[in-house]
Amino acid sequence: MVQTKNFPLETRGEAVSREALVQAALKEITQNYREASLSNVAREYGVSLAYVSECVRAETGRTYKELLQKHRMETAARLLRRSDMNIQQIISLVGYENTSYFYRLFHERYGLSPREYRLVRTGTAPRRPTA
């Protein structure tokens, strides 16, 4: 069955709308952003990864990866403003394993390093552990 924007997709004997798939993908991002995977949504609904990806892009104008990165960066920025967690803890918490990659994405989005962002937004430098 070919899916169009307003017609349901038959899967596992049930009708699933594109909107339901997109909402499930967005829910995966907001509730499981550290380990979010579009594969989870595809598996849950019994559809292909490519199909869910296409639905997300068609409905939001962005790829799943772009939406996930946006949510992770916004969460990291909020934690930098509102917590005294160190930057490495925040990087891990929001789901990045590669620190350099996180720093690059953060700088591209906010024009500052995470440390600079925290300093500018809170007016205080993070506490350093004493030896």
Positions of predicted regions on the chain:
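Basic/polar phosphate-binding segments, predominantly the helix-turn-helix DNA-binding elements
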Residues: 35, 39-71, 91-116
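Basic, amphipathic alpha-helical hairpins
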Residues: 3-10, 14, 24-37, 55-60, ...
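…primarily DNA-binding HTH/wHTH and HhH modules…
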Residues: 7, 12, 17, 104-131
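The cytosolic transmitter module of two-component sensor histidine kinases
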Residues: 18-22
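Terminal helix-turn-helix DNA-binding modules in bacterial transcription factors
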Residues: 23-31, 58-97, 119-131
